[in-house]
From Swiss-Prot:
This is Serine/threonine-protein kinase SZE1. It comes from the Eukaryota. The keyword Phosphoprotein applies. A lipid is attached at residue 2 (N-myristoyl glycine). It catalyses: L-seryl-[protein] + ATP = O-phospho-L-seryl-[protein] + ADP + H(+); L-threonyl-[protein] + ATP = O-phospho-L-threonyl-[protein] + ADP + H(+). Expressed in roots, seedlings, rosette leaves, floral organs, siliques and inflorescence stems. It comes from Arabidopsis thaliana. It is a lipid-anchor.
């Protein structure tokens, strides 16, 4: 692989961050190879563990440097990189405690290497399905994760003029630190068309299916902030039931039609460790998020307010 584009040879982008002084570091391939032991510290598909000096952001050794995640992403074209830089510029000026921090990047031909914070507990997606998760999270932790993610989404929606909503929102986009605080990753923005969801930034050239599509997307190919609320509702439903990929259509129908039984719907691993009223209100909130009519769904701020109220029970 060749050298990454330097700050002086980046594709034309007037406000693109070009240095560590501006908050986002432009790395070279050599830097990243050194930081990750030649990309040998694999964590998951396309992602390696690396170490850098927290002050200079130069490569460092394990035990000395700060742990970072280095993600390799294939780009459809240079325009995809230009689009990504627009998001980077916005996020440099609109940080949020529940939003994953971008440390730097490297752009080389059709590949983008993203250097971001390292999250030792991985993603929420690993903890949802009770058949495959490493451990069951207690009610309080699940609620804390939900609130953290909702805080970030409400923040992004409040900055809607920047076009940062309509994320490809899944449980794997919600990352967990050592204390299980949630941070939402914005990496991998999709381009939505009428016929399919096509990644402008993705792990392969195969277009993935929209995992949590709101009804309006299925009907028209269009979605907006209300679509985010629907997708978040699906995530809450999976967290509540522990069913993960095995979430049944009947379970969704039950909770939509208010024909749910709290004891039967909520993850049995939680047993009697949650307040029944909190469980009932969570079910009601999920039902509202999954409304077929997008106008009937709450805003993300209203979702956040409801989650905070549930946490007080």
């Amino acid at each position: 692989m060749g050298n990454c584009l330097s700050a002086s040879t980046l594709p034309t982008e007037p406000n693109a961050p070009k240095s560590v002084e501006e908050g986002v570091k432009v790395f070279t391939v050599a830097d990243l190879k050194k930081a990750t032991n030649d990309f040998g510290n694999q964590m998951e598909l396309g992602e390696s563990l690396g170490y850098i000096n927290p002050k200079t952001l130069s490569p460092a050794k394990k035990g000395v440097g700060m742990a970072v995640a280095v993600k390799k992403i294939y780009l459809a074209n240079e325009q995809a990189f230009q689009d990504w830089l627009v998001d980077v510029e916005f996020l440099r000026h609109n940080s949020h405690p529940s939003l994953v921090k971008l440390i730097g990047y490297c752009y080389d031909r059709d590949m983008l290497f993203i250097v971001s914070e390292y999250f030792p507990n991985g993603s929420l997606g690993s903890y949802i399905s009770r058949d495959s998760r490493p451990k069951s999270l207690p009610w309080e932790t699940r609620l804390k994760i939900s609130i953290g993610a909702a805080q970030c989404l409400a923040f992004l929606h409040s900055r809607k003029q920047a076009g940062l909503y309509r994320r490809y929102l899944t449980a794997s986009k919600i990352l967990l630190d050592s204390d299980f605080n949630a941070r939402v990753s914005y990496f991998g923005k999709p381009k939505v068309s009428l016929d399919e969801l096509v990644y402008t930034i993705g792990f392969s050239n195969v277009a993935p299916r929209y995992q949590y599509p709101p009804p309006e997307y299925i009907l028209s190919g269009m979605s907006n902030m209300a679509g985010d609320v629907y997708s978040f509702g699906v995530i809450l439903l999976k967290m509540l039931t522990g069913l993960g990929k095995d979430l049944t259509i009947s379970a969704k129908r039950e909770i939509k039609n208010k024909k749910y039984n709290i004891v039967e719907m909520i993850d049995p691993d939680l047993k009697n460790s949650y307040p029944l009223e909190a469980g009932r209100l969570m079910c009601e909130l999920i039902k509202q998020c999954l409304e077929v009519d997008p106008k009937m769904r709450p805003t993300m701020q209203e979702v956040l307010d409801n989650l905070n109220a549930i946490a007080q029970i």
